[in-house]
Amino acid sequence: MSRVSALEMAFSLMLESPRFVPSEAAGFNAQLHRKKIFSDLMAAFNFEVIVETGTFIGNTTGYLTTTTQARIFTCEANRTFLSLAKSRLSGLANIHFTQGDSRQFLRTLFASELLPAKLSKPVFFYLDAHWHDDLPLGDEIQIIAENLKDFVIMVDDFQVPNEPGYGWDDYGGKNVLNLTTFQSCFRQWKLLPFFPSLPAPQETGGRRGCVALAPEGRMSDKLRECKSLRIAQE
């Protein structure tokens, strides 16, 4: 997105929604089943730290901080969008904003706030920093998996197998958010992929696809128990 386009979008969004207001339409693309997935994961793991890449204007950030007691660390590459998110979310507690590349953001967190000695519970990662040709998802997953044993990742805009009604991001070539592109990455880091159990026509809001990832073993066993999710064919 060009700087001019970003400024135009930011100005329009500020006029339409100058402050974050909790509602069914706020966060996770206004998708109620997506929120159910997160609620199930929160009940299973009681996350104390949530990390988001791709703040955009802060709707999901606001949802996360108003529905949990977790500390939220969020990163946005576009300075204009980050400024807008900060303005819309001012007054809300436990949000730590960073402007910059999501990969460096994660590396910095693992050298500071995400040191094992500071963590008593698994960490939830919401990865939504994929608007550009330089798709950071594979690197983000590698950084997380190299540094933590207990975590859950949710990737927005990911293709849901056999459910074409859920949208996904396709930037051409190998820059497609689907299993064809990322299955080898998941296998390399021994992550099991889970998808929404709800058929796409029954979802609300943007009806964007997602995948939830957890390390094989104890973590993935808990995801198997979440009725809002289904395991990909193994």
Model-predicted regions and their roles:
Residues 1-124, 129-234:
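A short alpha-helical cap/connector motif
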